[in-house]
């Protein structure tokens, strides 16, 4: 199975809607330490660190995504494993439903959400910012993996 650190949210695999309320696909980014540490089989092989037999996932390094209040501003959340984005009504940086190229390029705080780095901005809606950013905390990730029997 191939895991990518960013792209269009795999809606079918996750069992969620393909598009947001504006008909555009959600995008995501996963920390490199998270997406490269899945085992290929029950023997625990295939990850970038040693994983015990029978464990299909192990976080081998700290997550490296950060969510800020503004570009260059204060931290809202640090060391998060994954971020999911709706690029809002203006759709800048989003992909249209059904496929196709990204719609335009955002700037300012919205630009931070599509510039291929590990920094994202989440703040209240305004005339210049309509992105919706959701992140997965490490605690929630560990809780769900334990509940699913994927972590000891």
Language model segments and positions:
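Short loop/turn motifs at secondary-structure junctions and domain boundaries
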Residues: 7-10
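Short loop/turn microsegments at loop-to-beta-strand junctions
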Residues: 13-15
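Short, surface-exposed interaction loops/tails
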Residues: 24-25, 30-152
